[in-house]
Amino acid sequence: MLDPEMIRRRIGESLPPGSHVEVVDTTGTGDHFEARVVSEAFVGKGMVQQHQMVYAPLQDLLKTGELHAHALKTYSPEQWQKLGNR
């Protein structure tokens, strides 16, 4: 069973300082997660590229099946602010 904090840490360590990562276990089973990530690294990148950047540090968990499902919401800081968030 995976811990949301471990997932958050892996994603956060792969992105520039100042990135914001939130991870929630959506089923309580430790294998289905949802992440919301805000990072300058996403500026100028399409959604597919952004998601690839987030999935990269999780590849080993996806390959072994430890991480079964991971829903992503990724934003540049500007996109995040346009949604009314700070």
Regions found by a protein language model. Name each.
Residues 2, 30, 45:
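Residues that form or flank phosphate/diphosphate-binding pockets in enzymes
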Residues 17-34, 39:
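Short edge beta-strands and adjacent turn/loop segments
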Residues 28-30, 42, 77-79:
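Short Gly/Pro-enriched loop/turn and capping motifs at secondary-structure junctions
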Residues 34-51:
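A short interface-forming secondary-structure element
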